[in-house]
UniProtKB/Swiss-Prot annotation:
Cofactor binding mode and count: Binds 1 zinc ion per subunit.
The family this protein is said to belong to: Belongs to the class-II aminoacyl-tRNA synthetase family.
Organism per entry: Caulobacter vibrioides (strain NA1000 / CB15N)
Binding-site residues for Zn(2+), renumbered to this chain: C340, H391, H517
Enzyme Commission number(s) of this protein: 6.1.1.3
Gene (name only): thrS
Role played: Catalyzes the attachment of threonine to tRNA(Thr) in a two-step reaction: L-threonine is first activated by ATP to form Thr-AMP and then transferred to the acceptor end of tRNA(Thr). Also edits incorrectly charged L-seryl-tRNA(Thr).
Superkingdom, natural source: Bacteria
GO CC aspect terms: cytoplasm
Name of the protein this chain belongs to: Threonine--tRNA ligase
Length: 655
């Protein structure tokens, strides 16, 4: 008999060789009908998988998964990819299938076919997919002999599947899933039949790809799709996509005249005056926050000798993404992909005492990394970017306090920028790692304690830490519910060893500092893209590249409008003057499309009475204020939140 432990802690016995379906049926007929998968000791398995001794080596924690389970959605998406592949091969004989994994919110499948797919083809494929769902084809798992599997796929012209099997370790079990008469190499798990996939799916786009991501290999055609547990979920997702397209930072960058990227500088941002104004406002804000938090700003070289990157380990780990060149004198130089080795060089100049720690070193460091052309995306994924990078050199006993301080700073920055901290992931020791278990125990405990002290709930990611230390990853949720991973806190006890960083301890001995790598924005370019999409371009007044446009109704108000702009500029505001001989409604529409937060309308009446008519972006109507009151209101709106807090404290002290 088999003992299984259920989520409520109860234990029940079942006959040897029972399947998940047998267990569900023994509980209730209704559960048997709803059951799609099982989970045994954290592993998701087919509903009809027999519970054999090789699966029952753990605690035997058992769960029956229905359509509502998050794990079921992953399988629905993967099964939809299989239905897609079957539909393609039915409609386009001779097409080879390669791989079809899940991605965020959906899936893709790569196909080898000489003639490219068209958007019309997607409609035909989607229709055939729904027919396959209606057929209710049974899905079964089969274990095959390796050589027989290779011979089978070679025999039907599926060279990519045969190659995948050849490349698998000899110890791997070869499993093929049969879906009606169609077969595919797959580890599983899968749903019991195609009807359980449902019809809450949609094919979304076509793209090119290379076999195994290598541009030297054959080019493939990729079909992307999304799939959900219900039609309502699909509809909500499609609405989010529609909204995301409206907010696309690439479109906003053009309409707001912020930046562009061109063929001669792939992945390199050309910042226009307004875009650079936004960049500098964000940079100045971050500089003030870091200054107030006790960081010292530094600047390190863009190009360093390859030998330093070899010593640090980056040449080995990141060499494929580094830009290198050889000088006329034979030096091999590398453009820096990150700032940490340079910061250790500064730390190593002069003897450091334990009294000087923690030492918080910050740099708005321009970095360059090679990204394949197909992977780049606007200013969110580029080859040249600037990190809000900092490294904290501290003693072991200071790690928890410094980490907690950083988390508080990060949370405050996100709040100021109108973003919500959604999730904090905690990545622990991987199998391949440097350092002793005792060192890792201390490091993981320190980060966990810091997160707890800062009130953060952690999502555990076992084994996902870097080889040199555990890390925290901080994700934001934007206005339409998308999650963006931005901030990081990485504990490193390897790089100080590699680059010989040390300090004199209290007892006079020399010790290695612990190094905390940390970033809040991640990169300025990507974070500006996130801000633009979060606010749909309608940035808060303090961040907006142009804060106010003073637009005239008539030329009689030109002199007054110039006076207003001069006063706004003296207050430190980014103000523009629009004296064009155009109708005021045309001017308002144009500046609204450019996402200017405030338009100050002036005509003969406002000029004569010394007033301003303020129109807010997205608001209805306008408010008419005296010039003095309008300047006060606009100055208040344009004051960065950290400056406003400092002024409030100053006023409270002097009151």
């Amino acid at each position: 008999m088999i003992d299984l432990v259920f989520p409520d802690g109860s234990s029940r016995q079942y006959p040897d060789g029972a399947t998940g379906r047998d267990v569900a049926a023994a509980i209730s007929k209704s559960l048997e009908k709803k059951a799609l998968l099982i989970k045994l000791d954290g592993q998701v398995l087919d509903l009809d998988r027999r519970l054999t001794p090789d699966l029952l080596t753990g605690e035997r924690k058992f769960e029956i998964l229905t359509r509502e389970a998050p794990e079921a959605l992953d399988t629905i998406r993967h099964d939809t990819a299989h239905v897609l592949a079957e539909a393609v091969q039915e409609l386009f004989p001779g097409t080879q299938v390669t791989i079809g994994p899940n991605v965020e919110d959906g899936f893709y499948y790569d196909f080898a076919r000489d003639e490219p797919f068209s958007l019309d083809d997607l409609e035909k494929i989607e229709k055939r997919m729904k027919e396959i769902v209606d057929r209710d084809e049974k899905i079964t798992r089969e274990v095959w002999d390796r050589n027989e599997a290779i011979a089978h796929f070679d025999g039907i012209g599926e060279q990519y599947k045969a190659q995948i099997i050849r490349d698998l370790p000899d110890t791997d079990t070869i499993t093929v899933y049969r879906q009606g008469n169609w077969k595919d190499l797959c580890r599983g798990p899968h749903l019991p039949s195609t009807k359980h996939v449902g019809k809450a799916f949609k094919l979304t786009k076509l793209a090119g790809a290379y076999w195994r991501g290598d541009q030297n290999n054959a080019q493939l055609q990729r079909i992307y799709g999304t799939a959900w547990a219900s039609e309502a979920d699909l509809e909500a997702h499609l609405k989010r996509i529609e909204e995301a397209e409206k907010r696309d930072h690439r479109k906003l960058g053009k309409t707001m005249d912020l930046f562009h990227i061109q063929e001669e500088g792939k992945g390199m941002v050309f910042w226009h005056p307004k875009g650079w104004a936004l960049y500098r406002v964000l940079e100045d804000y971050m500089r003030r926050r870091l200054d107030a938090a006790g960081y010292k700003e530094v600047k390190t070289p863009q190009i360093l000798d390859r030998s330093l990157w070899e010593k640090s380990g980056h040449a080995e780990k990141f060499g494929h993404a580094m830009f290198m060149c050889e000088s006329a004198e034979g030096e091999v130089l590398a453009v820096k992909p990150m700032n940490c080795p340079g910061h250790i060089q500064i730390f190593n100049v002069g003897q450091k005492s334990y009294r000087e720690l923690p030492l918080r070193m910050a740099e708005f460091g321009a970095c360059h990394r090679y990204e394949p052309s197909g992977a780049m995306h606007g200013i969110m994924r580029v080859r040249a970017f600037t990190q809000d990078d900092a490294h904290i050199f501290c003693r072991e006993e200071q790690v928890t306090e410094e980490s907690a301080r950083f988390i508080e700073l990060l949370r405050s920055v996100y709040n100021d920028l109108g973003m919500t901290l959604a999730d904090t992931k905690f990545s622990t020791r991987p199998e391949l790692r440097a350092g002793t278990d005792e060192t890792w125990d201390k490091a993981e405990a320190a980060l966990a304690a810091a997160a707890e002290a800062a009130g953060e709930t952690l999502t555990l990611q076992p084994g996902e830490g870097a080889f040199y230390g555990p890390k925290l990853e901080f994700s934001l949720k934007d206005a339409i519910g998308r999650v963006w991973q931005c901030g990081t806190l990485q504990l490193d006890f390897v790089l100080p060893e590699r680059l010989d960083a040390e300090y004199v301890s209290e007892d006079g001995s020399k010790k290695r500092p612990v190094m905390l790598h940390r970033a809040i924005l991640g990169s300025f370019e990507r974070f500006i893209g996130i801000l633009l999409e979060n606010f749909a371009g309608a940035l808060p007044v303090w961040l907006a590249p142009t804060q106010v446009v003073v637009a005239t109704i008539t030329s009689d108000a030109d002199d007054y409008a110039r006076e207003v702009v001069e006063k706004l500029t003296k207050l430190g505001m980014r103000a523009e003057l629009d004296l064009r001989n155009e109708k005021i409604n045309y001017k308002i529409r144009e500046h609204s499309l450019a996402k200017v937060p405030v338009i100050a309308v002036v005509g003969r009446k406002e000029a004569e009475t010394g007033q301003l008519a303020l129109r807010r972006l997205g608001g209805e109507g306008q408010s008419v204020l005296s010039l003095e009151e309008a300047l006060r209101v606009l100055k208040s709106d344009a004051t960065p939140p950290d400056v406003a807090r400092a002024l409030a404290v100053q006023e409270a002290v002097t009151a």
